[in-house]
Swiss-Prot record:
The chain crosses the membrane at residues 351-371. It comes from Homo sapiens. Residues 111-223 are annotated as: CH2. Keywords: Adaptive immunity, Cell membrane, Chromosomal rearrangement, Disulfide bond, Glycoprotein, Immunity, Immunoglobulin, Immunoglobulin domain, Membrane, Secreted, Transmembrane, Transmembrane helix. This is Immunoglobulin heavy constant gamma 1. PROSITE patterns: IG_LIKE, IG_MHC. Residues 1-350 are extracellular. Glycosylation on Asn-180 is required for interaction with Fc receptors and ability to activate the complement pathway. One of its GO terms (molecular function) is immunoglobulin receptor binding. Pfam families: C1-set (PF07654). Residues 372-399 are cytoplasmic. Immunoglobulins are composed of two identical heavy chains and two identical light chains; disulfide-linked. Interacts with FCGR1A; this interaction mediates IgG effector functions on monocytes. Interacts with FCGR2A and FCGR3A. The keyword Membrane applies.
Length: 399
């Protein structure tokens, strides 16, 4: 098959089915060749809760794959989720907005609002990554993305405002041509850590000849009193210790807002084989999440120290760390468990041998008794047959 760019389809639940704690948004990447294709969410800003499935070769000789991200249901009305697809062999880049369907065929819905301009450019505004806003050594950025810019009107103008005051330090990247003969244009505004954490509002204003009026998008940190996360580490389950790999768990709860970063390390080196759930809204208005690190059982049993690092604005210095290792108490417990298992195995072996010997003894005794009784019975019968004639002779002589 010749080189072919993918078709991208957003996969989203209806708004009626997202009433639970989380919602799954998906992206189907179909009919491309050759491998590979890369899928990210919100231009890489969203990594938690993302799972991209392996590509599947279809009978047509073309590949397909899907990517799913799990997000809090409460965020669907306030945050934008974009599936970014990049197929380098065909020089194809596609951005698809994924959002719940607002109308349902089986229900009467009010008229859906008209888009800003049917077939014209669309604008999306993304917040900085939580880790970037919490570490002074990193640079937080607010990103404004314009898609579906036509060849006829390729020029896009960006104006940025912080709390209503225009700023001029944003950088606009070269426009990128998409598979559908449109352009994608990105402007990035570097922000101050404290400005973002203090709740300043950022506005991106986009002007283009294809638009009847400029499009404005605003974004800021979630409002509300920050709440400090509580961090707990959990060792592997005893049942899991029979396997070659074990799971170390980090529970982070009671935090607000949901912007948080969780990482793992061991002996000062980062650990990459971990998965972190998206923040889940709890009944008290705070959020919680779980992070699971998978390691070889041998590393755990050797006493290596594993640390769960959490970054959140409500923490002192925005950072805390909880460590976990095979402590003497846990080691003793595991040893006792193994010893108990060994003792039980030995006990069952002893019981089995005892029962076997007992049954053999009973069978032997029964057999011996049977032959003894048979011999005695035969002797008595023979003796009786010998005595009876003599007794009759004696009676005859007496008469």
């Amino acid at each position: 098959a010749s080189t072919k760019g993918p078709s991208v389809f957003p996969l989203a639940p209806s708004s009626k089915s997202t009433s639970g704690g989380t919602a799954a948004l998906g992206c189907l990447v179909k009919d491309y060749f050759p491998e590979p294709v890369t899928v990210s969410w919100n231009s890489g800003a969203l990594t938690s809760g993302v799972h991209t499935f392996p590509a599947v070769l279809q009978s047509s000789g073309l590949y397909s794959l899907s990517s799913v991200v799990t997000v809090p249901s409460s965020s669907l009305g306030t945050q934008t989720y974009i599936c970014n697809v990049n197929h380098k062999p065909s020089n194809t880049k596609v951005d698809k907005k994924v959002e719940p369907k607002s109308c349902d065929k089986t229900h009467t819905c009010p008229p859906c609002p008209a888009p800003e301009l049917l077939g014209g450019p669309s604008v999306f505004l993304f917040p900085p990554k939580p880790k970037d806003t919490l570490m002074i050594s990193r640079t937080p950025e607010v990103t404004c993305v314009v898609v579906d810019v036509s060849h006829e009107d390729p020029e896009v103008k960006f104006n940025w405002y912080v709390d209503g005051v225009e700023v001029h330090n944003a950088k606009t990247k070269p426009r990128e041509e998409q598979y559908n003969s449109t352009y994608r244009v990105v402007s990035v505004l570097t922000v101050l850590h404290q400005d973002w954490l203090n709740g300043k509002e950022y506005k991106c204003k986009v002007s283009n000849k294809a638009l009847p009026a400029p499009i404005e998008k605003t974004i800021s940190k979630a409002k509300g009193q920050p709440r400090e996360p509580q961090v707990y580490t959990l060792p592997p389950s005893r049942d899991e210790l029979t396997k070659n790999q074990v799971s170390l768990t980090c529970l982070v709860k009671g935090f607000y807002p949901s912007d948080i970063a969780v990482e793992w390390e061991s002996n000062g080196q980062p650990e990459n084989n971990y998965k972190t759930t998206p923040p889940v809204l709890d009944s008290d208005g705070s959020f919680f999440l779980y992070s699971k690190l998978t390691v070889d059982k041998s590393r755990w049993q050797q006493g290596n120290v594993f640390s769960c690092s959490v970054m959140h604005e409500a923490l002192h210095n925005h950072y805390t760390q909880k460590s976990l290792s095979l402590s003497p108490e846990l080691q003793l417990e595991e040893s006792c468990a193994e010893a108990q298992d060994g003792e039980l195995d030995g006990l069952w072996t002893t019981i089995t041998i005892f029962i076997t010997l007992f049954l053999l003894s009973v069978c032997y005794s029964a057999t011996v008794t049977f032959f003894k009784v048979k011999w005695i019975f035969s002797s008595v019968v023979d003796l009786k047959q010998t005595i009876i004639p003599d007794y009759r002779n004696m009676i005859g002589q007496g008469a």
